Amino acid sequence: MEQLANQLRQDLQIRFTDPVSIHQILRSKNIIAYFRPLEGLSGMAIKVSRLEKDTSYLFMLVNTAEGYCKQRFTACHELYHLLCQKDFNVSYDKVNLFDSTNAEERNANIFASYLLMPTMGIRQLIPADQQRKDSIKLGTIMMLEQNFRCSHNSMLIQLHDIGLISQTYMDAMKGNVKNMAREYGYSTELYEATNKTELVGDYNLKARELFDQNLISQAKYFSYLRDMDIYKDTQNAKEESNIG
């Protein structure tokens, strides 16, 4: 999973010390993505194969009623399903309930972690005197998560998984993340919901192409538009670089 995530960064020329650009990936991979507030669902991915060509239509839905950092993780999670998973069709990920019993869901989480927080980038940003296990300071952890635009808990887990902190040390570093951010002079926006609506790509056009090529029924075509509120939102949805 780490190699796949690193390769995607390299293909798009994103440095390991930089935050990954979700929008850059969406555009380069021709993924139609819709960001909007949802209830009970963190994200969804749909892949529809074209019959006459070795290509697919790729769709993603992300819940903006969750924290900005969670939105980025969800998007990266769905990227695994769309770009890496074999024989993939559809995935629904409920709020706070990624299916840990499913091997591909675990793979998606691991892929998302390395895409957001690459080992090489983390190690390059940590001061030399904090490279030993359990020596990293809270201020450095806060700097890392702000830099990579990820959640506090995700960063702690990643630091643990790459051997920089123990479980005991990780537990000691947990707390009210917004208070910790303020203490170190950071904005709390990373951890807050954006509740924005944004459409990346021409979803309406792609859905119509699927219908015209008999890849989906008329009922499914209108269901896609209705479920994602295309009629109501496409007139107003402007690209706001919601999740970077």
Model-derived segments and spans:
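Active-site hotspot residues in diverse enzymes, especially metal/ion-binding acidic/histidine motifs
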Residues: 1-244
